C-alpha cells in the first residue's frame, strides 16, 4: 500500500497520453496500480493534494526503475527537482517524512529514465 487519503478531493494519476485515473477518498493506491500506469507511458504524473496524510509500505521504492527516477515537485510555488531516489535524502519507509515532502508541493512527478519497452 502506498498512499492513504484523509478527505476529498482525489489524487489524479495521468501520463502524457490519454490514460487517467482518479483515486477518491478512502482508496489505497497500490503498487499494481502504478504498474498498470507504468505500462502505458514513460512518464507518470501523480497530482497529490495536501490531503495526503500518510504513506505506507515501500511501493514507491519498488516501483519499476524508480531507483533512477527524478522526483519533481513544487516548493513554495516553484517547480524544482527534489533529487533522485538514489540520492534523495528521504526515509522512504517513514510515512511522516514522505508525506511532508508530498505536502510541500502540488504534485510529485515520477520521471523514469527508461521505459518498460526498453527492457523488451
Predicted feature residues:
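Structural signature of tandem-repeat unit edges
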Residues: 1-31, 40-54, 64-77, 83-120
